[in-house]
Amino acid sequence: GSAIRCGESCLLGKCYTPGCTCDRPICKKN
């Protein structure tokens, strides 16, 4: 299985990657 990557920026406080939450300035895995 492929691991979820949570490296997107979330300056607006929202992550679009499933299973990730915003930890400004980037998304982190739940």
UniProtKB/Swiss-Prot annotation:
Source domain of life: Eukaryota
GO BP, one annotated term: defense response to bacterium
Disulfide bonds: 6-20, 10-22, 15-27
Keywords from the UniProt entry: Antibiotic, Antimicrobial, Disulfide bond, Knottin, Plant defense
Annotated tissue distribution: Expressed in root nodules but not in seed.
Domain description: The presence of a 'disulfide through disulfide knot' structurally defines this protein as a knottin.
Function comment: Probably participates in a plant defense mechanism. Active against Gram-negative bacterium E.coli ATCC 700926 (MIC=0.5 uM) under low-salt conditions. Not active against Gram-positive bacterium S.aureus ATCC 12600 up to a concentration of 100 uM under low-salt conditions. Exhibits immunomodulatory activity but no cytotoxicity in vitro.
Family: Belongs to the cyclotide family. Moebius subfamily.
Protein name per the record: Cliotide T20
Biological classification of the source: Eukaryota, Viridiplantae, Streptophyta, Embryophyta, Tracheophyta
